[in-house]
Amino acid sequence: MTDDFEPEMDLAEQIFMLLCEQPEGCSEYQLIQQLKARHSTHIPNLPLLDKLVLFRTHFLVFNALYRLRDQLWGENRHTLQISPLCVQLQAYVPGTSAVVENDPLREYYLDMTNLRDTDEGEVERLLASFW
């Protein structure tokens, strides 16, 4: 028996499976390493040393996380804490608002043109402005 993910599984489904296995949560980096170890076909299996590979991998993971959070909240199943330092499934609590209506980060990561239109020069500018 193999622990590899089925290729037809969506990245959000793969992430959900990983998060269910670790209720304490994990960092984004740990999540990426676990996806690679289970041969996810949705993220590049390349070292994260290249800035463009790092950006694209990060973007794909965060896109999947925001889609998963919306799905789980819509199904009244879980809330999802999303941060590079800790991604964690949390209990759904009726009457609370886990999904913010105007969330610029959510909007950014759900817009796939941001992935497609960001080249190496733009990644350099983003990293320079971040640090």
Question: Model regions: which residues?
Answer:
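Short "pre-J" leader segments immediately N-terminal to J/J-like domains in DnaJ-family
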Residues: T2-W131
